[in-house]
Amino acid sequence: MEIFRFHTTIPTMISSMALTLILSLCGHAAVAQDSKLRDASSCHISSSLQGQWPDTDFTRCTIDLSEIRSGGPPKDGIPSLDMPDFIALSEADYEPQSPLISVVFDGEARAYPLSILIWHEIVNDHIGETSFSVTYCPLCNTSVVFARDHGTYTLDFGTTGQLRHSDLVMYDRQTESWWQQYNGEAIAGALAGQSLTILPSRLESFAEFSERHPSGMILDIPSDHQRPYGITPYNGYDSARYPFLYEGSLPEGIGALERVVVVNDEAIALFHLMQARRLERGDIRLTWSSGQASALDKAVISEGRDVGTVIAQRQEDHGKLVDVPYKVTFAFVWHAFNPESPIIGVTADEQ
C-alpha cells in the first residue's frame, strides 16, 4: 500500500481538488450561460443592424432579435455621461419634489436628478472601489443601478438607440454586447446569456435625499451638452392610454401606464401600496410616502403630479432594515417581461 506524505502529497491533493471544484463551477456557469443562447439561425438580426454594428456578434443571442425596434436616435445619439461632475446640495437648484436616483457606496451618497438622466439615460460612475452605472429608461419609467465590474471587465455602457418592449437596450464598449436595461441581461454579443449585478438604489425626491444625506453630492448639469435640463420631452406620457413603440399585449385589469413596484420577482400595483402605505411581502417591507413629482407628466419636471416615493427594505436578523433593489415601472413593462405573472393588488384575490 502506498503511504502518502502529509506535508507534500495531501496539500497538493487538496489544492488539486479545490482547483477542480473551481473549474467545475466555472464550467457549470458557462453551461448555464450557453444554455440561454438560441440557435444562431433563430436570432433574426436585420442586415441593416448588422452593418451598423460590425463588432457585435449577433450569432450569439438569447432572444429573437426581430423584437428590436429603433427608438429613433442612432448609436450614442442619446449620450451617456462618462465623466460626471458633482456639486454639494447647497449649490444645487432643485425644487423639494424633484425626482432623482440615489445611491450610497462606501459611505458616500450621490444623487442623479431625472431632469438630467432623462436626456442621457446612463451615467457611468464609481465611488471608491465600486464601479457602477445609473440608468433610466423614460419610456418604461425604469431606474436600475448596475455593477460595472463583470468578470474580467469593467464595463462602460452606452445607448444603442434600440428598444425592446419599449425598454432601453444598452451596449458595453468593451465587447459591444447588447444588454436589456430592465433586467440587466445580455441579449446579444460575446456576453449574451450573462447578467449584470443589480445594486440597491432609491428613486426619491430632492427633499428626501437632502434630509437623509445633507453632506451628499448631486450630479452637476453637464456643460458639454446642450439640453433643456429640467424639461421633459415626454410630458403627459404617463397619462397616455398606450405605451410608445410597444407592440405586445397589455395587462388586464390595470392601465398599461399605471405604475407598479417590482421587487423579488413580484409586481405590486402602486395604487395598492399607496392605499396601504406599508406592505410586508415575505421578508421585504414596502412603504410609500408622498412628495415626489412624476418626470413624465408636466413639461417642467418639478411641476409633475405627486407620485410619491417607494422604499423597499429587508429586515435582517438583528432588526436593521437594509435597502434592496426594486423598480417602479409601468404595468405593461412588467407584463412584457413576465406575461404569466399577475400584478398584486389589481383584483381582490391578489393581495
Feature map (PLM): residue ranges:
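Bacterial N-terminal signal peptides
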Residues: M13-C26
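Sec/Tat signal peptide C-region and signal peptidase I cleavage site
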Residues: H28-A32
